[in-house]
Amino acid sequence: MALAIVTSIAFACSSDSTRPVPPAGPKFSALLPIEAGQVIGAATYAAGDSSTGGQGAPVDGIACDTTTPIQHIHVHLTLIANGQQRAIPIAIGVGNPFILQNFVVAAGCYYWLHTHDATGIIHVEAPVATTFNLGQFFAIWGQPLSSSNVAGFTGSVTAYVDSTQYTGDLGAIDFQERQQITLIVGTVPDTIPLYAFPADY
């Protein structure tokens, strides 16, 4: 009887030692500082909306105007494609921008979702208190957004909202204050960067 128990324990231990261990998920960096006007990532895209983007016309009910916002929040977007972080360009959603020290300081009009620089920070400045999403931002930018194509980079797409993996419709990611959205096309890096928003944001 004792021999049978010992044999069973030994078998169980042996089985546990050969059981495959699931791969560990990526790590997330300590919060990295952001300075206004900084370029975060490789310059990959031209400034502003693409030819299929907003270009001043209303997009999904979002206007390019100069109305006073009653909602003002900030979201950070990181895009990593083919193993390299790509800069989200300056002046997305900005008509006739005036740029000083790599920062949009004035414009003919602003979409309610726009970028002032190439840090990856999306500014939500709207005259209405409502929820906006990532799909609307990409529509203003004029870039594709799907489970197999992000801003022209194709392949398997992995998404994180803050440090939690997101598996739903990418376009349906709702913007929340100081949220961090990471889109990865291809291999997920060992460490995913997270950022500290500037103190005055």
Residue positions per predicted region:
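C-terminal motif of bacterial Sec signal peptides marking the signal peptidase cleavage site
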Residues: I9-A12
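Ubiquitin-like/PB1-type beta-grasp interaction modules and other compact soluble beta-rich domains
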Residues: T18-Y201
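Bacterial N-terminal signal peptides that target proteins for export
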Residues: M1-A2
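Short, conserved catalytic or interaction motifs in soluble domains
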Residues: S15
